[in-house]
Amino acid sequence: MSQKEAGKRILSGVQPSGKLHLGNYFGAVKQHIELQNSGECFYFIADYHSLTTVHDAKTLSQNTLDVALDYLALGLDPAKAVFFRQSDVPEVNELAWILSTVTNMGLLERAVSYKEKVDKGIDASVGLFYYPILMAADILIYRSSLVPVGKDQVQHIEMTQDIAGKFNRCFGEIFPIPGFRLDKESKVPGVDGQKMSKSYGNTIEIFAEGKPLEKRVMGIVTDSTPVESPKDPTKCNVFALYSLFASEAEKTALEQKYRSGGMGYGEAKKALLAKVNEHFSAAREKRKELASRPGEVEDILKAGARRAREEARATIRLVRRAVGMKDEPTL
């Protein structure tokens, strides 16, 4: 446990947006799950946020279940972390509305992610524009002190800090100002050599198996250097992916084979395929077991929601009192 995370309340949210791939795993998921052994962790499935891009009920429901299965299979332990659906804590929407009343339009208009998503063809909905306020509510309602994020989310954390500061100046010191921890960047090339991304269609899925996985790995783009010739591992996508899984000794051994010549890229791809299967085999089996017991997964999410709502309700009572409302709505 690092000094930075010790004693912190850590919040991490993931949008249910499809199948996990190696870029997701090494870029964020693995790091976030490991944090459960550090501070007090809250992990939520951001299904409210997902509505900005997913407008099919069956798709959203299935994607949400997939995220739960993925994270639990990859090692998220509900005994160590609070794991729940965002939509099971409706208080977050009440807080988002209250926060919106102290948030200037100019702050939202500067949101880079909104502009980028609209440029990519996503509908410029009010919900998409409002996204940073709901994200601020997600963070503040659990009184989070640390949020692990990638570079593309830093602005949203800074906006949350601004919104919390404005609220505190208006109504008193209610919210701790959250900090963030940048995810360690991992260079994860896709099968075409570009950054691995769903939008490029170049991913290797974590839970793919058998022929589909083999076809994907064996299809990684390489140069045309002959089998007998030495090769430069630093310029090879296969070696870059292999290095994410291998020990230093294993990397050194494969590097020597590259530089010595006599090894084709097909052999390197088979070594990578073996590593991928070795690394994820236990998680794949666990995911299958969990998928056969959906009631158990639902129980985990409900238990997490009960714990999360306790925190959310305590915060919203403080907020309602601070702004001049009754602690609880009159029924």
What residues fall within each predicted segment?
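A generic secondary-structure signal for well-formed alpha-helical elements
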Residues: 68, 75, 103-106, 144, ...
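Conserved nucleotide- and phosphate/pyrophosphate-binding catalytic cores
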Residues: 24, 155, 161-331
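Internal, conserved structured core segments that host functional sites
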Residues: 114-163, 167, 171
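Short, polar/flexible loop-turn hinges at active-site or ligand-entry regions and domain interfaces
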Residues: 56-57, 147-150, 228
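Short helix-capping/linker segments at secondary-structure and domain boundaries
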Residues: 105-109, 141-148, 246-254, 284
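Short catalytic-loop micro-motif centered on adjacent basic/acidic residues
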Residues: 82-85, 148, 225
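N-terminal Rossmann-like or analogous alpha/beta NTP/dinucleotide-binding catalytic cores
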Residues: 2-137, 288
